[in-house]
Regions:
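Exported/periplasmic ABC-transporter solute-binding proteins
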Residues: 23-39, 43-337
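Alpha-helical transmembrane segments
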Residues: 12-16
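C-terminal motif of bacterial Sec signal peptides marking the signal peptidase cleavage site
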Residues: 17-21
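Positively charged n-region of N-terminal signal peptides that target proteins for export
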Residues: 1-5, 10
């Protein structure tokens, strides 16, 4: 539990540090996340001194798990600190669907069964920092955002790689969408044309994402100038920044402003007209298309399940990941062979 307290504190600090870079909706989410984590840390501090005794009682297999862990410092009897994304995150939406964490109830409504014990992070960067700083945590990020600060585990024996996604061996993948409402401005359309051209698709491929059109034509700008506001998913943002850099290099009259938040906020902004192009790391919801949005898939991306670099776990089944995120599996001795 001490690990979890530290993780909550780290998450709260990271969420607070990112407030300045987000829009109003992002600010509210980050503040809420930071306040919640601070309160949770305060509440948990009183129980922290008893964490050793509590973790020792996790399962009847504690003795065997401890013996298996003698070869290293990783203690299998520790609780799993589950780290998830916020409501509204396209990555969370895709993750819970692909792993079966989201299920329909008797009324046919979709229910997110993510454990209430999950630590909530409000961006890809905070997720990476949280897992990299907590030896006993587990999380998930866009494959294109994966770096060596954490370790991606294989799912059912398949590594999270572009080639495995293309071959179908790694099935945890989703689309990156952009969305517009009505007829885009000339400069917004020019930027979209760049993204879907051979030039734009090459940028996508170069940044570890999967292009959707290998036969796209070379880009020819319409010469439009002006400002384009692009808002939404923190998973799509990194590759959108790369696309922006490449585009303005060939059309210096264009100004591209990227506002990072989450998929739902981006789609709402596109519907409201407060941005020109929305970003979503998932399929659009019926309510969003009914609200007048037109989606364009610009890339495919995998979702990598991540653990701390000091965690010896290298492979998990989809059922095990589901069990962890629904709270059925609570300690690493229920995972590590």
């Amino acid at each position: 539990m001490k690990k979890k307290v530290m993780c909550m504190l780290l998450t709260g600090m990271m969420a607070a540090s990112m407030i300045a870079g987000c829009g109003n909706s992002g600010n509210a989410s980050a503040n809420a996340a930071a306040d919640t984590n601070t309160d949770a840390s305060t509440d948990a501090s009183g129980a922290a001194d008893n964490s050793t005794d509590q973790s020792a009682d996790v399962t009847p297999d504690t003795t065997a798990a401890s013996a298996a862990a003698e070869s290293g410092d990783f203690d299998n009897s520790e609780y799993i600190n589950v780290v998830s994304r916020e409501d509204g995150s396209g990555t969370r939406g895709a993750f819970i669907e692909l792993f079966g964490v989201e299920e329909k109830n008797e009324a046919g409504d979709k229910i997110d069964n993510t454990t209430d014990e999950a630590i909530i992070t409000n961006s890809t960067d905070v997720m990476l920092t949280t897992v990299s700083g907590d030896e006993y945590s587990i999380g998930y990020v866009s494959l294109g955002s994966l770096n060596d600060s954490v370790k991606a585990v294989s799912i059912d024996g398949a590594e999270a790689t572009v080639d495995n996604i293309k071959s179908g061996d790694y099935t945890i993948a989703r689309p990156f969408n952009i969305a517009t409402k009505g007829t885009p401005s000339d400069v917004a359309q020019d930027f979209i044309n760049f993204i879907m051209s051979a030039d734009g698709q090459a940028v996508i491929s170069d940044n570890k994402y999967i292009p959707v059109d290998d036969g796209a034509a070379a880009f020819e700008s319409n010469g439009a100038s002006g400002k384009v506001v692009v808002a939404g998913s923190s998973s799509v943002t990194p590759v959108m920044e790369k696309l922006k850099e490449a585009y303005v290099a060939v059309n210096s009259g264009a100004e591209i402003e990227i506002q990072e938040s989450d998929s739902t906020t981006g789609m709402t902004a596109a519907m409201d007209g407060t941005c020109d192009i929305g970003m979503a790391s998932r399929e659009l919801k019926d309510s969003e298309t009914e609200g007048g949005l037109t989606a364009t898939v610009i890339a495919m991306d995998g979702i990598a399940v991540i653990v701390n670099n000091d965690n010896p776990t290298s492979d998990l089944s989809k059922d095990t990941v589901k069990g962890i995120y629904t709270g059925e599996i609570t300690s690493w001795d229920g995972v590590t062979e």
